[in-house]
Amino acid sequence: MESALTNATSQTNFTTIDWVIVVVYLLLSVGIAFFVKRYAGNMTNFVSAGRAVGTWLGIATLTGTEMGLITVMYSAQKGFTSGFAAFHIGVIAGIVAFLIGVTGFIVVRLREHEVLTIPEYYEKRFGRRTRILGGIMLAFGGLLNMGLFLKVGAMFIVGITGMVPDSVAVNTVMVVLLALVLVYTVIGGMISVVITDYIQFVILSVGILVTGWLAIDFVGWDNLFKTVRTYKGEAGFNPVAAESGFGWEYVGWMFFLGIVNCALWPTAVARALAMESTTALKRQYTWSSISFAIRMIIPNLLGICAFVFVMNKAPDLQAVFFPEEADVKAVDNLYAMPIFLGRILPAGLIGLITAAMIAAFMSTHDGYLLCWSTVITQDIIAPLFKERLDNPTRIKITRILIVLIGLYILYWGLFYTGEEDIWDYMAVTGAIYFTGAFSLLFGGLYWHRASSTGAVLALMAGITAVIGLGPVQQAVHNWIPGSIAEQTITATYEKTIEFEAFKEPDEVEESPVRDMVVDFVMTPFEQAKPWRFNGLKSWTAVVQNAAGQTQAVEIRTSDPDAVTVSAWPEDFEPQVGDTVSIYKPLSGARVGLMTIGFTLFVFILGSLIFPDRKQKEATNE
């Protein structure tokens, strides 16, 4: 499969002239950072560009940061796997951004407080301990959230340029990209970020529109709908269709994420706090609602075009991404869009598009690196020193943290093994921070009875969102309600393992109170019925051998005394005497919605039971 992928990426139109275009652009970006270094002399200028960003530059820099290469890649991945049904994510994002622009929900009141970061507001409203804890939760969730950005960006460059898609190439590209981003973010701060964001906004806007037009022209507009209908049916168009992989639960989760992206996520809020006035801020969000939708819909379309191309015009790619043999692992579908573009775009233009995508990559990374390093400096380190740090020291600490965070995302990209779609991974890791942050900002700004104890409890409750990650669920699966405890394996052959047969339990005498409690607790979970044929289909089996090694695999079919899995890894084979436990994975959307409800509950309850002795006004400045 590795050789097949190498052959697939090698058929690119990327040439020497394209490399020249990319290098010239990168040198221009670094040059800008050196030029504006003189203007980054204090923390306000370094972090928020002196709070002097106008409406149209604000729109450009907000779009530049929020439409990074990671956005293009995860949106294309959703289009490739889900078809036109994925459009609902972008449509919802645009609608929510427009409503926030019209109402000023959360962001206007934050701007009126003239804070540099969200945790700084926590201190004004709830006290120093809340600010420090909020900064820790924000940094923890945010760093996990951006952990795969670097690897995904490297995969795009490897796929579109025709490099050998092995770990050496991906890792080398990761190091080079990280070095470039670190140089101009460390040197210039937010001023260089805003200026490069503007340039990248222009290049990326033109590049993504031209690419979309060429992609549709190549595969044919009619073929788009026909192919999606043929292979995906109604699920390729309707996000609430049975087989779409989304559903109403996911749609509701997307509405909340729309609020998060605009009003809670620090990189977007940092742009709001840099605006020259609240009027400019509201205008920024109102107009940016268009880009909030387009930034996902056009990459969705590129992913759909890649799917149509693979299924109709590239049998070699079809064998790579959709192998017929059940025991052959499909290649990561993140490669689909860049390989597709590498084959259809002409030399010269492909260099411009790649430069635009790298621009998007750098735009996101500079904003995120600056944001998280600022949070750690301003909201964790500075409060611990009781504000005794002067501006030069804070800037120096921030620059050191930018480098350390860069090294962390390099490490995380190399070693994280989760199999979630990138968008779903980002939503879950971000929820560690934003589920608690929503309670604190909404309650703190609009509810005068919100207390510091309730705030601390809500922030701590947000950590439960980490259960949405696949590796974490696997580690704690025995604690998930409805799961099946360890069973001893009595026989194995090929992809099937046998154990003692499950029997349907006898009916228990009805108890209205007990039934009500059980129904309430089990509502988010699925109760196992292993005595039925295929009662465990699509569940996950976790096999543990005598050495303590575990392996999780999806169940394809099940009987009362056996399960058949999709495939065993080459280096793992279950034996008689090993144990198997079984659980139903929780979707990221379900975990996210559960965490939102949980954090709001503990915030309200904590505020009512433990009110502050001296209440602060919700609009306190």
What residues fall within each predicted segment?
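Membrane-embedded helix-loop-helix hairpins and adjacent transmembrane boundary segments
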Residues: 1-562, 569-621
